[in-house]
Amino acid sequence: MRTLWIMAVLLVGVEGSLVQFETLIMKIAGRSGVWYYGSYGCYCGSGGQGRPQDASDRCCFVHDCCYGKVTDCDPKADVYTYSEENGVVVCGGDDPCKKQICECDRVAATCFRDNKDTYDNKYWFFPAKNCQEESEPC
């Protein structure tokens, strides 16, 4: 029951690009981003500090860094366009900022797919107190 409540809290207020990010993770990695990465390691979910715990957590670290480089639009809210060509997601549209958000999400979803074998349940709901080391630069 606690897990269902946490999942509901994670979904409250989610709009725009975050919904699209979830869709891309499902499409590319074949699993739910909210479920598997909504609260994982030191970087997956809200916030982020310390050292990434494994390759899956590093995907989130790189995604956070990518979002940090986006200017002139809101990576968590703005809606972008993409298409699928021969099974490959291609970011599109005329707005370079929104295209950059899409690329951040596409790269992260691909990273999750490529690192499924490193996913370790011990990092699910990982305590923030274990993420106190100095963060590495992006």
From Swiss-Prot:
Superkingdom of this protein's organism: Eukaryota
Pfam families: Phospholip_A2_1
Keyword entries, A-Z: Calcium, Disulfide bond, Hemostasis impairing toxin, Hydrolase, Lipid degradation, Lipid metabolism, Metal-binding, Platelet aggregation inhibiting toxin, Secreted, Signal, Toxin
EC number: 3.1.1.4
Catalytic activity reported: a 1,2-diacyl-sn-glycero-3-phosphocholine + H2O = a 1-acyl-sn-glycero-3-phosphocholine + a fatty acid + H(+)
Signal peptide: 1-16
Binding site for Ca(2+): Y43, G45, G47, D64
Keyword check for Chaperone: no
InterPro entries assigned to the protein according to its UniProt record, in alphabetical order: PLipase_A2, PLipase_A2_Asp_AS, PLipase_A2_dom, PLipase_A2_dom_sf, PLipase_A2_His_AS
S-S bridge residues: C42-C131, C44-C60, C59-C111, C65-C138, C66-C104, C73-C97, C91-C102
Compartments reported by the entry: Secreted
Cofactor note: Binds 1 Ca(2+) ion.
Catalytic residue positions: H63, D105
Keyword field contains Hydrolase: yes
GO cellular component annotations of the record: extracellular region
Principal subcellular localisation of the protein: secreted
Tissue expression: Expressed by the venom gland.
UniProt miscellaneous comment: Negative results: does not inhibit platelet aggregation when aggregation is induced by ADP, and does not induce aggregation of washed platelets. Does not induce changes on the principal platelet receptors (ITGA2, ITGA2B, GPIBA, SELP). In human umbilical-cord vein endothelial cells, does not induce detachment, does not interfere on nitric oxide release, and is neither apoptotic nor proliferative.
Role description: Snake venom phospholipase A2 that shows a potent inhibition of human platelet aggregation. This inhibition is concentration-dependent when aggregation is induced by collagen, and concentration-independent when aggregation is induced by arachidonic acid. In human umbilical-cord vein endothelial cells, this toxin stimulates endothelial cells to release prostaglandin I(2), suggesting an increase of its potential anti-platelet activity in vivo. PLA2 catalyzes the calcium-dependent hydrolysis of the 2-acyl groups in 3-sn-phosphoglycerides.
Family per similarity comment: Belongs to the phospholipase A2 family. Group II subfamily. D49 sub-subfamily.
Name recorded for this polypeptide: Acidic phospholipase A2 BE-I-PLA2
Organism of provenance: Bothrops erythromelas
Lineage: Eukaryota, Metazoa, Chordata, Craniata, Vertebrata
